Amino acid sequence: MQRFIKWLAVITSLDLLIVLLGGALVTKTGSGQGCGKSWPLCNGEFVPSNLSMETIIELSHRLTSGSAGILVTLLCILSWKYYKHVRETKTLAILSFVFLVAQALMGAAAVVWGQMPAVLAIHFGISLISFASVILLTCLIFEIDQKFDARSLIMDKKMKFHIYGVTIYSYIVVYTGALVRHERASLACPDFPLCSKNRPMPTQLHEWVQMGHRVAAMLIFAWILYAMILAIRHYKQQPVVYWGWIISFILVTLQAVVGVLVVFTNASLAMALLHSLFISCLFAVLCYLVMLGTRIKVNAKEAGSTSKQTK
């Protein structure tokens, strides 16, 4: 059974990643109304008779979201049953399921009633939490933390602050990026790093949205760079922290490069999807560091109780 659960966890993680990228594809191609205003049917039909490209994209996104719902539910039930001895299992299972349902309902509401771009931008963030929760659940199932000897992890308050702070801030950056997509502001500023050679400062809403995201992205790049330097200097003996920040910096660098290429490739589809891919992976890595950070007090308590028993 455990082998089956491991396969299920991997397939579920991949399915949720496809859901995230599929949502970005729907937004990028303007396929949100590919099935009209009907849900769960498509243009009022179970199998649509008129298949335009927008319909195919929207319908595919709905099907992958539906399969993800089934897989996440099954994974939550089995992990709850067979891995309940791991303290984070129940919390992650609940988060995975609740946020997946929330993003599905929000997606349906957007189709039927429509939503403001500011509200639609939350949709990607909700999906991202579900994805990260499933990734962490998968890590627990594969006992990744034991391979890194996470029980002996030592971390000072400064490093924990950076882990929690960057993770929370990354979610804000994700929202600003999603807002850029939903406001159709990807090409509002045709130059980089300033908005335009003729007008370096933004003058209207779409330009402010675009430049706001750029500033937020530059700040997270600098923050992760600083945290990585700290990890390299002081955490070489803690591989999970050391490599966690190095991987995070690689991902945020790729994210930044692709973000610039989005501007200079006229917001090509490939760059837009890579932009969503890298931020999804980065958020998952940061959430894993958060999970380990929450264990520090537990590890300390366990060590304290053990020493008392020894005395």
Curated annotation (Swiss-Prot):
Single biological process term from Gene Ontology: heme A biosynthetic process
Listed transmembrane segments: 7-27, 63-83, 92-112, 122-142, 160-180, 212-232, 244-264, 272-292
Extracellular face of the membrane: 28-62, 113-121, 181-211, 265-271
Pathway it works in: Porphyrin-containing compound metabolism; heme A biosynthesis; heme A from heme O: step 1/1
Compartments (UniProt record): Cell membrane
Any GO MF annotation of the entry: metal ion binding
Gene Ontology CC: one annotated term: plasma membrane
Bridged cysteine pairs (disulfide): 35-42, 189-195
Named cofactor requirement(s): heme b
Catalytic residues (UniProt): 58
InterPro entries in the record: COX15/CtaA_fam, COX15/CtaA_HemeA_synthase, HemeA_Synthase_type1
Alphabetical keyword list: Cell membrane, Disulfide bond, Heme biosynthesis, Iron, Membrane, Metal-binding, Oxidoreductase, Transmembrane, Transmembrane helix
EC code: 1.17.99.9
Topological type in the membrane: Multi-pass membrane protein
Residues annotated for heme o binding in this entry: 61, 123
Cytoplasmic side: 1-6, 84-91, 143-159, 233-243, 293-311
Subunit structure, interactors included: Interacts with CtaB.
Known function: Catalyzes the conversion of heme O to heme A by two successive hydroxylations of the methyl group at C8. The first hydroxylation forms heme I, the second hydroxylation results in an unstable dihydroxymethyl group, which spontaneously dehydrates, resulting in the formyl group of heme A.
UniProt xrefs under PANTHER family: HEME A SYNTHASE
Family recorded in the similarity comment: Belongs to the COX15/CtaA family. Type 1 subfamily.
Domain notes from UniProt: The N-half (TM1-TM4) and C-half (TM5-TM8) domains are connected by an intracellular loop. Each domain is formed from four-helix bundles and they align in a pseudo twofold symmetry manner. The N-half domain is the substrate-heme O binding domain and the C-half domain is the cofactor heme B binding domain.
Protein name from the UniProt record: Heme A synthase
Gene that encodes it: ctaA
